[in-house]
Amino acid sequence: MSQKQLWYEKLHSSFGQYFSIKEVLYRDKTDHQDLIIFDTEEFGRVMALNHVVQTTERDEFIYHEMMTHVPLLAHGDAKKVLIIGGGDGGILREVCRHAGVKEIIMVEIDQDVVNLCQEYFPHHHAGAYDDPRFQLKIDDGAHFVEQTNHRFDLIISDSTDPIGPGEHLFKSSFYQACRRILNAGGLFVAQNGVCFLQQTEVINTYQRLMPYFSDVSFYQAAIPTYYGGIMTFAWASENANLRRIGLNDLESRFADSGLKSCRYYNPFVHFASFALPQYLIEALAKKAPK
């Protein structure tokens, strides 16, 4: 009996997770990062960049639904959406489900990620790249937000961790530029790692967003392959009421949206996602401006 091939993630140096590989589908170095796509028994196809899991077929819906429907339904009338990163197509797929959105721009630094995910993860994008509202720009997201004259109602930063190509998407200058290109009433959200294991990252984001937005907070979801507890998503706007919408209003917006086949998101999950664990509340309070 042949020994199974194992792949070990290298996000943390002293602990981690591994996957038993059925088949390596692709492995190479792009212009920006090491990329591997492999098939597994438990999680289907998996993509990792620089030895860190980015997405899996089995649980991607949790991440993509929460990164998309929470801010879109909280905003209530977003017409123009900017996606930073998101080359696997999952965020795009979910944004395209909102008929009220009229323009979607996605800025991805790595063309190879887009091409390979279209080939190996067809259910992630589900044809969304052909949506007439969509434009793809191959560029560094930090450079794009510094230079663009476009304005947006929602910015979704679907970045990697703050290492390698994704490092610039966690800097104060990036958040300042995002604030500049948001319309009045606009909203910014970003993935921010697993707060129990990456609390420094969460606190850094909080401190760097505070100078540019009057309301900065986080919401959360549990995503199995982002192990170690709940994953946090940064939330920044000029209107604190956007994260305080009542359950009745959320149910009404959800019903009107036509989102009938969500697998994770619902208005109750949305409402509850802003409830943060006490250790995180206390850590953020220590860093809040006096």
Swiss-Prot record:
The keyword Transferase applies. It comes from the Bacteria. This is Polyamine aminopropyltransferase. S-methyl-5'-thioadenosine binds at residues 33, 108, 140-141, 165. PROSITE patterns: PABS_1, PABS_2. The active site is at residue 158. Residues 5-238 form the PABS domain. One of its GO terms (biological process) is spermidine biosynthetic process. Keywords: Cytoplasm, Polyamine biosynthesis, Spermidine biosynthesis, Transferase. Gene3D superfamilies: Spermidine synthase, tetramerisation domain, Vaccinia Virus protein VP39. It catalyses: S-adenosyl 3-(methylsulfanyl)propylamine + putrescine = S-methyl-5'-thioadenosine + spermidine + H(+). The lineage of its organism: Bacteria, Pseudomonadati, Pseudomonadota, Gammaproteobacteria, Enterobacterales. Spermidine binds at residues 64, 88, 158-161. It is found in: Cytoplasm. Pfam families: Spermine_synt_N (PF17284), Spermine_synth (PF01564). It is an enzyme of class 2 (transferase). GO terms for molecular function: spermidine synthase activity. GO terms for cellular component: cytosol. Homodimer or homotetramer. The keyword Isomerase does not apply. PANTHER family: SPERMIDINE SYNTHASE, SPERMIDINE/SPERMINE SYNTHASE.
